[in-house]
């Protein structure tokens, strides 16, 4: 059935014709080839790439360009006609994929590779997968857009010529991008061929900057990781649909029970699903004497923090009802929406990048960290009572075990590693304290960072942890005191940078002279911070060294050579530089995880997903899980040993210790 009504009158014409299949070139021996797919993908924005997994999701045409050589657009499924023989095109491309050993170039290559694999075109001998939308955020991750057009303009190109395409779309009454599959191929061919040649031209200019910034190490790492992440999405994660059904029933039952108890106590009825409506739950809270503030719209202001602060069974019941409702309506529903034939095909974002649907804005995380979407597998229930039960819906491959291999205290170890290398920057005494920490790890790789620092400082573990995290994340003294549960004070700074309480005589004098008031650590908190800094000086000294480096050059360099950059403020100075240490250890930890994924994949290990500090595998036995852990520990030599905790089970939840019984 045709979806397209040919126009009665046309304002455009095209003399483009598809190439003769018999004249197409061999890719064997080519240094670089660019490739791009035009697709029909109606659910892309809502559910992510379909790649042939969902109905009406398929390639309509494939374009290629050999660097400094021939190329062409090969239409195969255009609704408007002008297609080449489907099997002939696929046979040609499958044959080229088998012999091509150079670099494959493109823009948003994972999207194209996923669709191509659906048609049996798989590039298993490629040297590197060079994606200009990976290269560009490596060169600078601070841009607002990483669309092909924005990247082209940054590198001095006009971008894609869409004039003919858009004019034809107007004649046919369709959207020129999402409905391109409807057009006759003759109106798409020229656009598609230029679309493929452009990344080759952009990449040449990007590579000069990659040379200038010495980014080849991290670019090669990301280029090796790209097909691995594409493979994770293509295969997907198995879902236990029976357990998913059970969890939905359990969550509905628990929500109903909680709301029934609220009614029993307060006399106010709240329907299932209404627990998120402030105006509905407000009467129950007011019944127990809670005075509620109003929003600017005049509605009761009831958020998570408020419910958590109320010491009363009704608040506890409402909070529980919200949690189990979210489990059912957000998490379970998202799995059902995205699941295809019992598997979830989520997208793993390597870097900040343009969204697959080419809409405004970007997807992905900064500083090299992986993120995921459609659905977000990195944002699953983790600390709730039902977290293990929920994660039990995620299964390994048939007949295998789920192995959760989790880096233990990855970022604190990275901080010790860098402090050991920074003697000239942090000073001899601070360096000695770092060496002391390093040696403790070398003597016992199971050393707990926060307890070690507590012992070194002679303070409680909880306090040592909060201070370490505060220094690592660039917190000020006042914020750290609030984290520690200690009082702060309003202070002013004297001429020699001394702090004075605003209520002291000197403080009042400085205020009268116009000194700026600000919140600072109180005496008790400051004494604790001073003790930590005196006994474990390398953390603060390293933080100051990172801040100084960021202020001077505008970036921090991580383990792989990645540059984590800082924006400039209105005065032209680098901003947020107090986050320098955080960028260093977060970015380097991300590098370590990515290096481990590449090394594990090259060793033939079967990665399922990556979440935070964890890489999950489908393994035959504990020996295989231990092999993966060994690679994770040793793929990046550090000044101290890395630790990887290994747990296996019949599902993700079972690997966490779930006993198979729902919470009461």
UniProtKB/Swiss-Prot annotation:
It catalyses: DNA(n) + a 2'-deoxyribonucleoside 5'-triphosphate = DNA(n+1) + diphosphate. Residues 352-378 are annotated as: Disordered. GO terms for biological process: DNA-templated DNA replication; double-strand break repair; symbiont-mediated evasion of host restriction-modification system; symbiont-mediated suppression of host innate immune response; viral DNA genome replication. Coiled coil: none annotated. Keywords: DNA replication, DNA-directed DNA polymerase, Host-virus interaction, Inhibition of host innate immune response by virus, Nucleotidyltransferase, Restriction-modification system evasion by virus, Transferase, Viral DNA replication, Viral immunoevasion. InterPro entries: DNA-dir_DNA_pol_A_CS, DNA-dir_DNA_pol_A_palm_dom, DNA/RNA_pol_sf, DNA_polymerase_A, RNaseH-like_sf, RNaseH_sf. GO terms for molecular function: DNA binding; DNA-directed DNA polymerase activity. Gene3D superfamilies: 3.30.70.370, 5' to 3' exonuclease, C-terminal subdomain, Ribonuclease H-like superfamily/Ribonuclease H, Taq DNA Polymerase, Chain T, domain 4. Its EC number is 2.7.7.7. DNA polymerase that replicates the viral genomic DNA. Also incorporates 5-hydroxymethyl-2'-deoxyuridine (5-hmdU) instead of dTMP into DNA during replication, as an early step in the pathway of thymidine hypermodifications of the viral genome. As a final result of the pathway of hypermodification, 5-aminoethyl-2'-deoxyuridine (5-NedU) substitutes for about 30% of thymidines in the viral DNA. These modifications probably prevent degradation of viral genome by the host restriction-modification antiviral defense system. Belongs to the DNA polymerase type-A family. DpoZ subfamily. PANTHER family: DNA POLYMERASE I, DNA POLYMERASE THETA. This is DNA-directed DNA polymerase. It comes from Pseudomonas phage M6. The lineage of its organism: Viruses, Duplodnaviria, Heunggongvirae, Uroviricota, Caudoviricetes. The gene is gp62.
